[in-house]
Amino acid sequence: IAHIEAVEDFPGLISSLNNSSILSGCVLNPDTPVEDALPILNDLDLVLVMSVVPGKGGQSFIPEVEEKVRILRKEIDMQIGNGGRKTKLMIDGGIKNHNAKLVADWGVDIAVVGSGLINNKGTISENLESITSAMET
């Protein structure tokens, strides 16, 4: 998984990885336009939408990424429906019990949880169970 902005020839990188039978993915920061990923979506195994500015744990969730997630979900579903790659949609940043259902409803396949597991509200396993339950309802 690489940030689109970090690689000069991102489509070339993805092509090279796919030609080597290596799974590939891209990261979209909160301010990265979703359109940057759409031309290569069918070549990606994973798209990770950052819901915080990367680099520091414990940041607040940025709900404005909803539109980006919903656009990607729609495009991925159409791609799969047309026999294309089964790209996974992932979100990372500020995922906690109170917003886990929200991002699940947006259509993410995977939510990365960090600081939502480690807090004074419960043990790691209790917090994980709470977040998992919220995403499944």
What role is predicted for each listed range?
Residues 47, 72, 92, 103, ...:
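Conserved, mostly hydrophobic/aromatic
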Residues 4-6, 48-59, 106-127:
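Glycine-rich phosphate-binding active-site loops on the catalytic face of alpha/beta enzymes
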Residues 76, 80, 121, 135:
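Active-site catalytic pocket residues across diverse enzymes, especially alpha/beta-hydrolases
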Residues 99, 124-131:
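Short, hydrophobic-biased amphipathic alpha-helical segments
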Residues 1-88:
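Conserved anion-binding
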Residues 32-44, 93-111:
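Catalytic cores of alpha/beta
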Residues 4, 8, 96, 125, ...:
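Expand to "…catalyze enediolate/carbanion chemistry for C-C bond making/breaking, isomerization
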